[in-house]
C-alpha cells in the first residue's frame, strides 16, 4: 500500500480479494485439541450429521513415519485443483541442530535462470547450480498445457483431470529440485564452516521484465521464493545466519 500511495506500484494491479466461488473449497485447519492420531493414522473430526449420513464412516489419513516422535501442533488439509487432490501439512516444532561455523565466512548467492544459483564465498571458492532442468520441465508443461487447454475449450471445460495431473506432477518435480538445491548449498556451508549466507533479492524483479516472451515466461513461472524460503528454514535449523540483500 505504501508503494501505491507513493506511485511506485501500479494501482490497477492492486484490488480487493474476490469472494470465494459458489462451490469453492477452503482449507481445514485442525488445532492441537482437534488432532487425533492413533496407530499412525489421523482421524479427521466430523459432525454428527455427517456421521449419520455416511453410517459412521470416518476419514483416516496415514501419518508419515518420520513424524512419530514429533509433537504435532497443527494440521492443515488444503484442497488442490478443485478438490481433485488434497495436500496435508503437519506443523511441528523442529529442534535446532547448531553446527560449528565461522561468522567471518560468507557465501553470496545470485539467483537466476540458466544458473539457478551462482554462489561465491569470501574465501575465493565458487560454484554454480544448474537451472536448465527446471527450464526443461517448465517448457514441457507449457507445451502440454496449451494442447490440453485447447481440447478442453472445444468441449466447454475450463480444466480437466489430465490438466490437474500434469500440473501436480510439474509442481512436485520443481519443488524436488529446489529443495535439493537448497540442501546442497546448506551442506556446502556446513562442510566449509560458513556462518552467513547473503542472497540477492529484489521484491519487484519479476514485474516489467523485457527479456523476451519465452524467457519472461520461464522466469516468472519458476518459484525462486520457494528456494529462498527453504534456504531460510534450513539456515535457522543449523544456526547459519541468512540475509537478503536488495540488488
What are these regions (language model features)?
Residues 1-80, 221:
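Acidic carboxylate diad motif detector
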Residues 84-247:
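Positively charged, helix-rich recognition surfaces that bind polyanionic ligands
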